[in-house]
Amino acid sequence: MTTLAVIVTSVAAVLAATAQTVQVPIFEYDPTFPKPLPENWAIGAIGGMAVDRQDHVYVIQRPGSLRGNERFTGSGDTPAKADCCIPAPPVLEFDQGGTLIHSWGGPGTGYDWPQTEHGIFVDHKDTVWLAGSGDKDAHLLKFTRDGRFLQQFGKPGMSGGSADTRNMGKPANLTVDPASNEVYVADGYGNHRVIVLDADTFAFKRMWGAYGNKPDDTPPGPFNPDAPPAQQFRLPHNIAISRDGFVYVADRPNNRIQVFRKDGTYGNEVFVSRRTLLQGAASGFALSADPQQRFLYMIDGANHHVWIIERLSLKVVARFGQQGLWGGFLNVPHAITVDSRGNVYVGENFDARRFQRFLYKGLGTPKAGTIPVTTIVR
């Protein structure tokens, strides 16, 4: 297995002080995942990632983000300018070996494909849910795992803001609660809310903003890290439900994750890289695979890290990853998911346009130096 030299940054002193007491998840970069794609396919920016009950890994990517020199074969030019490349279909499904087993997506009959592919989730019925963050994206889509269209909620271009219960507003991501068969949406790039619908009928159930407040679309103004915490979401970018019934929401530009009960009652919050500007630090997260789901793995798209957070205490305990385009490094991580074995999958945006697997190696005490992936204790 290829090893990766990682330079330990300024938290090394903290590492030395806590190394004897802190046990954190340790990961190793897996250079074998995924296998090469067929037909000279190229992938664009990664919108979202998910894992199903079979531990198959789903990726939704943006073919439209490929540049001209990355799509010569599919450009329609005669003769073709080069052998590479053809944009891959938006939805890709891989088995645990990294082999592509299904690919589908794009415009079709009976539904409106998103302008900008973003969120993906596979529920307890093996239904694949999709969300888009383009300017006109105000809807959700449901498909079978092999790409047969099932249902659409909302209509493109029809968003009525955060009070609208018939449309979304550039939704970022979603999750389905199997206990109640409800879909929870981080409705996010246009609106500023969590909205909950019946997963079959799309009947409206409830919605809330930051701290459980009524959603408010009043422009919040530029982010100021020295100001009191914003009382509304700036951009709820990711959402997940823990096994013990708590709802976690990543509010990206506010650099925080907030915790709620399923009825929208506010519980707690954690700020990570609180002074981050740009697009914000709290790009998304996944829950660890152990029965207690002890950890949150939060991707930080601005600082190019994965932060490890104790879920119940919300204490930031470690991180891995640093900026770079080499295997095992990170460049604008935008999506994250975890399989049943605890392996972490990270999808990247902008120039990286890739997804990587980090193998879970158990709990341990990380050490500074040259190891496959350095987990740095905070």
What residue spans do the PLM features occupy?
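Eukaryotic scaffold repeat domains enriched in small/polar residues
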Residues: 17-378
